[in-house]
From Swiss-Prot:
Single GO MF descriptor: D-mannose binding
Stated family: Belongs to the COLEC10/COLEC11 family.
SUPFAM superfamilies in the cross-refs: C-type lectin-like
Name assigned to this protein: Collectin-10
Positions annotated with a glycan in the UniProt record: 30
Record keywords: Calcium, Collagen, Disulfide bond, Glycoprotein, Lectin, Mannose-binding, Secreted, Signal
Source organism (scientific name): Xenopus tropicalis
Organism lineage string: Eukaryota, Metazoa, Chordata, Craniata, Vertebrata
């Protein structure tokens, strides 16, 4: 009887416990994972495997230039360059020494016997005619050139001969024409000739001054010495090559000593005929 009364009570207690468990289970289902984790401690799991290597990244910006490095070793000598342009022609060299006499040549063959002819006098006449014709041609050429222009003072005419000659040939050519190389013995004459040279578009010409006979003792073409007047360029005469015994006039009017073998134009002077 005692156990029979207790059965209903036991059943009632079990029912209450089951109901309580049901309520707890519903609360757990309705609660979020965060709430669950916040009320429960989760232990860390084991270490995972290494992941695969990622792709190469994009090339970054260039950095600043580093400090200047040390000087490198001397390189190998390069190949020779191409031949350059030909330079300007240098000044005329000094006159060379006279060469040795050559060896005698072989004797010529025997000539044919000639016929008799009394041609000597005719040859002399023909030879003189050739000389006269040559002088006439030279004079004709001179007259044609003179028409192109001369300069004059009260007593003299001056004419630039546009033929390249050395000093001695220039003297001869002026004498053949009846004059001599120009001798500027005063400032007025010197200025007239200098202006003449410039107006003709020239740079220099021979004039009648030299020290051929005695070094540093310059004389005119008529052998009269230089006296009170001269117009030397600064530093002249200097006999630079050791053979500068003749004189040229520049378009500036200055004088310069040069080698007599130089071939340039020259200026002649002629006395005016008095009436």
């Amino acid at each position: 009887m005692k156990y029979g009364k207790l059965w209903p009570i036991g059943v009632s207690v079990l029912g209450v416990i089951a109901l309580h468990v049901r309520v707890l289970s519903l609360e757990v289902e309705n609660s979020s994972a965060v709430d669950t984790c916040s009320t429960h401690t989760i232990l860390p799991g084991p270490k995972g495997d290494d992941g695969e290597a990622g792709d190469t990244g994009v090339l970054g910006k260039l950095g600043k230039d580093g400090p200047k490095g040390q000087k490198g070793n001397k390189g190998i000598i390069g190949d020779s360059g191409d031949l350059g342009l030909i330079g300007k022609i240098g000044p005329i060299g000094s006159k060379g020494d006279k060469g040795h006499k050559g060896l005698p040549g072989l004797p010529g063959g025997k000539g044919k016997s000639g016929s008799y002819c009394d041609c000597g006098r005719y040859r002399k006449v023909v030879g003189q005619l050739d000389v006269n014709v040559a002088h006439l041609k030279s004079s004709l050429k001179f007259v044609k050139n003179v028409i192109a222009g001369i300069r004059e003072t009260d007593e003299k005419y001056y004419y630039i001969v546009r033929e390249e000659r050395n000093y001695r040939d220039a003297l001869t050519q002026c004498r053949i024409r009846g004059g001599t190389l120009a001798m500027p013995k005063d400032q007025a004459t010197n200025s007239l000739i200098a202006d003449y040279i410039s107006k003709m578009g020239l740079f220099r010409v021979f004039i009648g001054i030299n020290d051929i006979e005695k070094e540093k003792q310059f004389v005119y073409a008529d052998n009269s010495p230089l006296q009170t007047y001269s117009s030397w360029k600064a530093g002249e005469p200097n006999d630079g090559s050791g053979y500068e015994d003749c004189v040229e006039m520049l378009s500036t009017g200055h004088w310069n000593d040069v080698d007599c073998s130089l071939t340039i134009y020259f200026v002649c002077e002629f006395l005016k005929k008095t009436k």
